[in-house]
Amino acid sequence: MYATDKAAIRNPFIRSELAKPGYDKAEETVSVEVINPTTGSVKCVVAGEITGENIRFSKEISLFCGETREIVFTPEEFPQLKIDNPRLWWPLFKGKPDLYELKMTVSVKGQVSDSLKTRFGIREITSDQNTPDKSRQFYVNGKKIFIRGTNWIPEGMLRHSDERTYAELRYTKQSGVNLVRMWGGGIAESDYFFQLCDEMGLLVWQEFWLTGDTKHPHDQALYLANLESTVKRLRNHPSLAYYVSSNESTEVVGAKDLIMKLDGTRGYQMQSECDGVHDGSPYKQVNPMQHYENTASPRGSRVDGFNPEYGAPTLPTLETLREVMDEKDLWPINKEVWDYHDGGGFHLMSTMYKDLVNNYGTSQSIEEFAKKGQLVGAMNSKTIWEVWNYNKLDYGDRYCSGLLFWYHNCPVRQVCARMWDWSLEPTASLYHTQNALEPLHAQFDYLKNMVSVCNDYYRSFKNYKVKADVYDLNSKKVFSYSQRIDIGEDEVLNDLFKIDFPSDITPVHFIRLGLSDEKGKEVASTFYWRSNAAYEGKEILTGPTSSGFESLNDMPTARLQTKYKTKEVDGRYYIEVSLKNTSSRIAFFTQLQFLDKAGKPVRPSFYTDNFFSLLPGETKQVLIDTSVDKVTEGEFSLTVGGWNVQQKKYKL
């Protein structure tokens, strides 16, 4: 219930029309609903302003008692709504997500009766099926965009908070993902969620509360009323890119017409697997080598076209596992309990995932198993994203227009995490996804032993150098090669050169790829661990991503020098960490942890990188931050350790 004055305004909408082909002129059409809640007629003035742009417009209108009328301001009637050289809104890595603000008032007899404000972005998002395989291709401001997206699942009990929303979306942006699909079995998220997506440059694919395993609502009028209010609430957000009625179902009669009536500026399809979007999979653990040969799905080729659901699990960290179940069920692994926390064993965490972990050597404790489990999760994520990088648009073996990772966030405590778990504790998958999706990226193909470079920027780079170095288990360099490249806007340079591994190389070894600019400054790097194990096909867990890693346990010890300082700025607590590998050995899979007085991770905390490796003499800066209200009482500490680095604890 709310009170109004003599006139009220609701549901503003700003439509942008951009001039082609330059996108250098915008025409804005503004509409708003004006309400007369009184029992008599009202004469009022409706006024608007695009703040900071010296754009103002107004109309005088009369409303009879109880009337609600949509008032429209067009650029033909108000030329000031024509904007030269508008600041366009762009998704992540494509440009700045610039935003404007619209303020509106309704006044009666010179007194403001009601007011509102909303932010909006000037951009155009379209899609078509003008592709070799008729898959759906998206465009932003006239440019093709390769969708590297994900599927958003709401918290299991809908226990949302601004803190949780901020953390999950900040992790999302950090990962490099550019689109979030609001899965049809979920909800329409909060205004704050969309506000953050606007600011972070994250596109949103919005579905409307129907899945393939549910019936249509009994009260369809109520459903359509909810649909109407949701579209009106969300349509000014530039991040909102696409409407889909359902997940693997059909639309409620009238849904499409209603959506197009309320907002004809975005595309629409009936359900998630039609109109150039094929059915998904894989969902569970497979041999990571299968991603390269495109055999990961039992449904056939799925690294092609637009795939709405393609993913793999990750084991949570040790600290989270101990919050999921009792110690007695953690180790030895109680298959019944683990399967219960894995959707009935759906992701194969107690079977195939465990077998992959054991290929790093049989574990003697849950601590050892959890540590090795992060390697498997990191390999899962990195191989998937890099295979899709390789096949981006028409640069690879087949046309690929987009991937939506299944799934993104954990709705409940479970043993099948993703980039982070329900407790908001990141796994190694976040940081290895972040590396795979960096906008300028050199990558290695485990099946072909080839090196490629991907550019996700809308600009080109000339006279860059890509370099590959291979080190054996004792950190001896056994291969090195570099090549100068020019890479075009949004381009992929595939199979630039092959790495020839020496026949006598240690069974496990490491690859470091570096990308340097024309001045010799390194702008990107990637680190891999690889075994000599031959890949014997998808039916068994073999291959250089998947088996033969036992000798990693014999890796010589490395030493890290750690320096740090703390500060508080604008309500955030920061730890600036400087690391240097002072030994002659590679420091493999180094992990930093910010812990409270009980030795538990401070959550949510944000690390610029983690689970990384450092060459002898290499340095790295890591910034950790959290809200200051997380560090008000007690002692806190920073731990630094790694696969072959003894963990050290530093009091903060």
Identify the role of each PLM range.
Residues M1-V180, A188, D394-C400, E425, ...:
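Secreted/periplasmic carbohydrate-active enzymes, especially glycoside hydrolases
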Residues K6-R15, Q111-Y242, D339-A378:
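Active-site-adjacent substrate/metal-binding segments within catalytic domains
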Residues D114, E228-E336:
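Active-site region of glycoside hydrolase catalytic domains
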Residues G186-A188, L210-G212, E248-S249, C274, ...:
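Active-site-proximal loop/turn and secondary-structure-junction residues that shape catalytic pockets
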Residues G201-L203, R266-G267, D304, G402:
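Proline-centered loop/turn at the N-terminus of a beta-strand
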Residues T105-S107, Y192, L196-L202, R233, ...:
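Alpha-helical structural signal in soluble globular domains
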Residues T295-D469:
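Substrate-binding clefts and catalytic carboxylate motifs of secreted carbohydrate-active enzymes
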